[in-house]
UniProtKB/Swiss-Prot annotation:
Its main location: Golgi. The gene is YIP3. Interacts with YIP1 and the Rab GTPases SEC4, YPT1, YPT6, YPT10, YPT11, YPT31, YPT32 and YPT52. Keywords: Acetylation, Golgi apparatus, Membrane, Peroxisome, Phosphoprotein, Transmembrane, Transmembrane helix. It comes from the Eukaryota. This is Prenylated Rab acceptor 1. It is found in: Golgi apparatus membrane; Peroxisome membrane. The modification N-acetylmethionine is found at residue 1. The modification Phosphoserine is found at residue 18. It comes from Saccharomyces cerevisiae (strain ATCC 204508 / S288c) (Baker's yeast). The chain crosses the membrane at residues 84-104, 129-149. It is a multi-pass membrane protein.
Amino acid sequence: MNQLGALAQVSRFTQNFSMENIKSEFQSLQSKLATLRTPQEFFNFKKISKPQNFGEVQSRVAYNLKYFSSNYGLIIGCLSIYTLLTNLLLLFVIVLVVAGIVGINKLKGEELVTPFGSFKTNQLYTGLVCVAVPIGFLASPISTLLWLIGASAVSVFGHASLMEKPIETVFDEETV
């Protein structure tokens, strides 16, 4: 029964890759990219300064995370791509698993007939797991993920804490 539950989860996962879902996600991505700030505004070196105290760091980070959220998402996306391109074994494992799941789902529950015999879908999934897990451990996904988290945090929080807020927001925060 546990295998049927796992198979149902995988089936629901692959249904998320339907053309309608892909189109709606693409439109959502386009609207998110429309809120990107210009490079001149994002890399404005005139607005970079050392914060006076930790309270100022907190207010800068809170403001800049909202204001530059699309830019920060793009930076994290670029760092993710860089991570996969520098760890080719991990990229291979990800492609292998996705291609294996898509290929098994194209069988639509039928057996795969080869000259070596016929294989049921649960046998194919088991074979995929038996191949992907050991190679996945060799690809060091945990250290790659930790590097990605660290590099993203340093990049995003470093920029957000050093970039000054616009002068208008300083006057809005003051109470008279």
